[in-house]
């Protein structure tokens, strides 16, 4: 592997920490869901909707966020999004009803859109053989979710109010938005910014972008869904306290986060598609374990899924800049949007199934079946063609 460009390490540090701050703000509502449930007397479906809504905007907003990063640069875009995300976070601290929480939850989802900005910003600092590792390290910003899940309940107890927690995280978001603007810099590039119509044309004519979106729907969507819903699931299914459930969820997030750069490094060495074969096969088996109602079996399944999802996230984002070097932000926006949507629907489905059957088992059966479907798509789109001929971006019209 070649030496990094001068300034690349600094850029990676600032993008990763900014992503962690954004992800922490994005995850606050889910982290404090047990508190809101008790405060407002929510049903399982109402609680699931509250958890899922921030994920929706955080998903759909990634496509335009990625386009903005490609056009105006990640430095400006990331700084602005960090500053704007602080507004709904602070407003939730002032809210006093479930309805207000839902509306503000839509806007706090803005923090989740910054993921696409960071991928575009980071990828431009590294050569193709470094991008899997670099984006895997950037993806460790997922630890922001762990900070929210574990830190928010602890801070709420320390301050004696959940409202103060939102004010604290809003202040951190503002601080890091200013820091990013002052000290982070865009990589020098000769690539001419693309127009909106050109961005849309890339998405329409590149089926590979949609295949990668499907894969990220499974890997990152699975990660987000479990990260935001585990506190509720553990409390409902296994009668854990909010603090214990938060600690276990933080462990899940931490493991998935640490495995993401490993997935990127393995993808640099062996190819992202080959790594994804193992990931999807593992998820199909681990989903079955998580459907079991016994704590030890569930724990093995959840920790195994954390490792597999982390590896998968790193592998997918090795493939994005590899096949779309000029449109990384735009394609990342699409792929990231699907990944976020993969985190939006499962909590809703789990809530409905819990109310209908009294269990979450059927939801994990769906996870296993979906992973098997992705396994088949990966084989026919990537590996089968690799056996026939050397795969190149031109094979997909990229």
Features from the language model and the residues they span:
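Glycine-rich segments within core transmembrane alpha-helices of 12-TM secondary carriers
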Residues: 132-150, 336-346
